[in-house]
């Protein structure tokens, strides 16, 4: 039986997973999304055209690939329908798990209200209602995509939920829809989405049993994992490679090659510890050149130097076999580039990620910069200093770099 390969982000998300999945997708029969919701965003450039995807897997740009939204994803029908409208002839190419949980408008209202109440202690969520949706799932009070096939029954269940939660909703200022409006909305969702709702676990199993090539597409990044990330400044799902198993119904033996996606520098959206953040001109330069604004929220990403300590930690959690190094071109023209090789922590030098990362100070190694890597298609033709930078990352993390992106375009990728 063939195993499924996995692409996973190894930093705080926004590493460039979409480009890698889109590039590798031509070699696969099926591409699967396993967790997260429309708080995640993949940006793909093809022939100068920008595609921003939030729920639909990146393989949708390839006509012969089956795309799966797995049970671990939380699905906003409204967002999904809007996103699907960008593409033609999706039947037979896109399937949504009937076990995936529904993210509805009241979830985002709850999310935003709670963030406002936290004031300065706000986590900095996207406000898309992802956390409240997963909270409903864990408390066994959520609703699943398969329930859209019976809109009247789902409407009754939701109205009962609204009544039960009315004191909380009133306190938070959540607007509860009228029953007739809700029913019409659910009927519309059914009309559009019914042909795509399926038992996706069986579809993935069948593909593997038939020796089809399957690629799993992670969302966000390992350092945002609900258990192993910088809690509480994390997302609400398991973003590590093991999350792909629970989010699709696979066992660990069915995971093959793990490709860890890393950016040549580091970015983070929202609040939370970020040891290598550069709040000066270098960070501003990375943001400007790298166009570091969120695909989902448009928020400016915090930027800083490459952190080999956190990447090594995340790579161990994910079982990374090889790296895809993205946005190397953004560092073009820097006279000096830095890599964090250790932390100063409570008076000691450490080479691991402590639970309270906010108390860690980076210890940097400085390397000489380079002029430009744009348009280079062979590793040997990269500037010597760029190669030295890549090879030092490999030495510090213990993982080889197999792919190097030198521009947003699909074609500008070096394969070693």
From Swiss-Prot:
Binds 1 Mg(2+) ion per subunit. SUPFAM superfamilies: P-loop containing nucleoside triphosphate hydrolases (SSF52540). Plays an important role in the de novo pathway of purine nucleotide biosynthesis. Catalyzes the first committed step in the biosynthesis of AMP from IMP. IMP binds at residues 14-17, 39-42, 126, 140, 220, 235, 299. This is Adenylosuccinate synthetase. It catalyses: IMP + L-aspartate + GTP = N(6)-(1,2-dicarboxyethyl)-AMP + GDP + phosphate + 2 H(+). Its EC number is 6.3.4.4. GO terms for molecular function: adenylosuccinate synthase activity; GTP binding; magnesium ion binding. Mg(2+) binds at residues 14, 41. One of its GO terms (biological process) is 'de novo' AMP biosynthetic process.
């Amino acid at each position: 039986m063939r195993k499924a390969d996995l692409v996973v982000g190894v930093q705080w998300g926004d590493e460039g997973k979409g480009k890698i999945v889109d590039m590798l997708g031509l070699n696969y029969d099926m591409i699967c999304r396993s967790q997260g919701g429309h708080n995640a965003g993949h940006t793909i450039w093809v022939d100068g055209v920008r595609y921003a995807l939030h729920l639909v897997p990146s393989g949708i740009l390839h006509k012969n690939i089956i795309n799966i939204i797995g049970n671990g994803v939380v699905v906003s029908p409204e967002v999904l329908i809007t996103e699907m409208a960008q593409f033609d002839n999706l039947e037979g190419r896109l399937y949504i798990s009937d076990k995936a949980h529904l993210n509805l408008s009241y979830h985002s209202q709850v999310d935003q209200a709670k963030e406002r109440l936290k004031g300065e202690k706000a986590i900095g969520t996207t406000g898309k209602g992802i956390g409240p949706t997963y909270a409903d799932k864990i408390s066994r009070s959520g609703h699943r995509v398969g329930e859209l096939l019976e809109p009247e029954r789902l409407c009754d269940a939701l109205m009962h939920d609204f009544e039960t939660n009315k004191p909380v909703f009133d306190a938070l200022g959540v607007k509860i829809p009228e029953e007739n409006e809700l029913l019409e909305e659910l009927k519309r969702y059914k009309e559009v989405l019914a042909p795509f709702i399926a038992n996706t676990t069986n579809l993935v199993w069948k593909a593997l049993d038939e020796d089809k090539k399957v690629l799993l597409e992670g969302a966000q990044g390992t350092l945002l994992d609900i258990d192993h990330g910088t809690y509480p400044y994390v997302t609400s799902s398991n973003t590590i490679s093991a999350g792909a198993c629970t989010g699709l119904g696979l066992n660990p033996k069915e995971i093959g090659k793990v490709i860890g996606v890393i950016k040549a520098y580091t970015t983070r959206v929202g609040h939370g510890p970020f040891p290598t953040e550069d709040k000066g001109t270098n960070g501003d330069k990375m943001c400007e050149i790298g166009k570091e604004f969120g695909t989902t929220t448009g928020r400016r990403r915090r930027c800083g130097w490459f952190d080999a300590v956190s990447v090594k930690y995340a790579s161990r959690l994910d079982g990374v076999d090889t790296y895809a190094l993205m946005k190397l071109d953004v560092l073009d023209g820097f006279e000096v580039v830095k890599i964090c090789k250790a932390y100063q922590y409570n008076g000691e030098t450490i080479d691991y990620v402590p639970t309270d990362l906010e108390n860690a100070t980076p210890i940097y190694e400085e390397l000489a910069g380079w002029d430009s890597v744009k348009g280079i298609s062979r590793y040997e033709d990269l500037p010597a200093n760029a190669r030295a930078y890549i090879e030092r990352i490999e030495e510090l993390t213990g993982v080889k770099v197999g792919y190097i992106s030198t521009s947003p375009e699909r074609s500008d990728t070096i394969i070693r």
